[in-house]
From Swiss-Prot:
Protein name: Large ribosomal subunit protein bL17
Gene: rplQ
Species this chain originates from: Rhodopseudomonas palustris (strain HaA2)
GO biological-process terms attached to the record: translation
Pfam name, any one: Ribosomal_L17
Xref: Gene3D superfamilies: Ribosomal protein L17 (3.90.1030.10)
């Protein structure tokens, strides 16, 4: 019986879900806006909200909790240094989900999940191959 089980399985094992949401948290913190399916966005939202709350509380123990959840030290640093200061006066509601139509291949409902008051310049930052590597190879 599924009494009290509120989270979606998303057709994945527990380890796969945990790894997927850790990667999605890191991507959202890095780019401050990502496009994903609507069910994944709805499951990601409370995880990210709790991470931002950890960042606002600060302290070494909270930082270690965030590292164990996300496993990306650069994004944990950004969470505690940048996002914690940005949302210091806001009591929850750090993210928004915007429905973005349906995916062409399988008609899956898509959504954009982003931080409220996000930094517009963070989108696409450090994505793909570096331009330095392409110049050195030539």
């Amino acid at each position: 019986m599924r009494h009290g089980k509120v989270h979606r399985k998303l057709n994945r094992t527990a380890e796969h879900r945990k790894a997927m949401f850790a990667n999605m948290c890191a991507a959202l913190i890095k780019h401050e806006q990502i496009v994903t399916t609507l069910p994944k966005a709805k499951e990601l939202r409370p995880i990210v909200e709790k991470l931002v709350t950890l960042g606002k509380k600060g302290g070494l123990d909270k930082r270690r909790q965030a590292i164990s959840e996300m496993r990306d030290l650069d994004q944990v640093r950004k969470l505690f240094d940048v996002l914690a200061k940005r949302y210091a006066d806001r009591q929850g509601g750090y993210t928004r989900i915007i429905k973005a139509g349906f995916r062409y291949g399988d008609n899956a409902p898509m959504a954009v999940i982003e931080f409220v008051d996000r930094d517009e310049d963070a989108k696409g930052k450090d994505s793909g191959p570096s331009q330095d590597g392409a110049a050195e190879a030539a």
